[in-house]
From Swiss-Prot:
Organism: Bacillus licheniformis (strain ATCC 14580 / DSM 13 / JCM 2505 / CCUG 7422 / NBRC 12200 / NCIMB 9375 / NCTC 10341 / NRRL NRS-1264 / Gibson 46)
Domain of life where this protein originates: Bacteria
UniProt enzyme class: translocase
InterPro entries linked to this entry: AAA+_ATPase, ABC_transporter-like_ATP-bd, ABC_transporter-like_CS, ABC_transpr_CbiO/EcfA_su, ECF_ABC_transporter_ATP-bd, EcfA_1, P-loop_NTPase
Keyword Membrane: yes
A Gene Ontology molecular function term of the record: ATP binding
EC number assigned by the record: 7.-.-.-
Recorded family membership: Belongs to the ABC transporter superfamily. Energy-coupling factor EcfA family.
Subunit: Forms a stable energy-coupling factor (ECF) transporter complex composed of 2 membrane-embedded substrate-binding proteins (S component), 2 ATP-binding proteins (A component) and 2 transmembrane proteins (T component).
UniProt-listed Pfam families: ABC_tran
Protein name as it appears in the record: Energy-coupling factor transporter ATP-binding protein EcfA1
Described purpose of this protein according to its UniProt entry: ATP-binding (A) component of a common energy-coupling factor (ECF) ABC-transporter complex. Unlike classic ABC transporters this ECF transporter provides the energy necessary to transport a number of different substrates.
Domain ABC transporter: 7-242
UniProt keyword list: ATP-binding, Cell membrane, Membrane, Nucleotide-binding, Translocase, Transport
Length: 281
């Protein structure tokens, strides 16, 4: 993985109210490397969504600093930073502003004054990346939740940011829609098109990331690969997080004496190893 740092957050603190007893972000430091998928997880009120807003300049930290693509985030640089960061939010219906898929993907480009010929090329390219090219002239009420979120991702891609932040972007989708969106994100990330930060309370979603930061009470509680973080097990449960079912089942099978080698984050991985063990019996 290319280790160029796209985001460097150093000791950031933020309070929504200056006299608040506890800050929403309490001396948080981390970095994000180019080409990485970082998941930031936590229960409601943990600080994860506040962190997402800080990374896009929707709020500015009271203390500490954030650099995005080498640019220090300030009131003067916030629009330069936002050109580098695109966001996909929770509710797909609240994000759809065009009358058709084509209009929606083009909306941000029109506001940025992109020439029409360039805009048409970008829209066509972006919808192809999310496999929505057959729906260009469809109205939003004809689309599923997963399809609307893929259109939102296309709108972000068309603007050509370095980083895409998914702020609970799958939480209102059914399982099929959720997998559609996450598979799309993984493919775009693997093809080197964008660096991904996903904000979520769902550890099944976080398991797909390269690295996880766990937030609790405004502080960084843990950080590591999915396997490293999930091994905290009961510590995560105590702060209101549910471990992925496949990981829990793997641990139960190991405790019962089954000689499993992996800490499986997906059901597919667990099933494959079980079949391998069965074939050796």
């Amino acid at each position: 993985m290319n280790q160029e740092r796209l985001i460097a957050a150093e000791d950031i603190t933020f309070r929504y109210q200056k006299d608040a007893d506890r800050p929403a972000l309490d001396h948080v430091s981390f970095h994000v490397s180019k080409g990485e998928w970082l998941a930031i997880v936590g229960h409601n009120g943990s600080g994860k969504s506040t962190l997402a807003r800080a990374l896009n300049g929707l709020i500015l930290p009271d203390e500490g600093s954030i650099k995005v693509g080498g640019i220090k985030l300030t009131e003067e640089t916030v629009w330069d930073v936002r050109k580098k960061v695109g966001m996909v939010f929770q509710n797909p219906d609240n994000q759809f502003v065009g009358t058709t898929v084509r209009d929606d993907v083009a909306f941000g480009l029109e506001n940025s004054g992109v020439p029409r010929e360039d805009m048409v090329e970008r829209v066509d390219w972006a919808v192809q990346q999310v496999n929505m090219q057959e729906f260009l002239d469809q109205e939003p009420h004809h689309l599923s939740g997963g399809q609307k979120q893929r259109v939102a991702i296309a709108g972000v891609l068309a603007a050509r940011p370095d980083i895409m932040i998914l702020d609970e972007a799958t939480s209102m989708l059914d399982p099929m829609g959720r997998e559609e969106v996450l598979d799309t994100v993984r493919r775009l990330k693997d093809q080197g098109m964008v660096t991904v930060i996903s904000i979520t309370h769902d550890l099944n979603e976080a398991a797909k990331a390269d690295r996880i930061i766990v937030m609790n009470s405004g502080r960084k509680f843990a950080e590591g690969t999915p396997q490293e973080v999930f091994r905290l097990n009961q510590d995560l449960i105590k702060i209101g997080l549910d471990l992925p079912f496949s990981f829990q089942l793997t641990q139960m099978l190991k405790e019962s004496g089954l000689a499993l080698k992996g800490d499986h984050l997906t059901q597919e991985g667990l099933v494959n190893e079980l079949w391998t063990l069965k074939s050796k019996m």
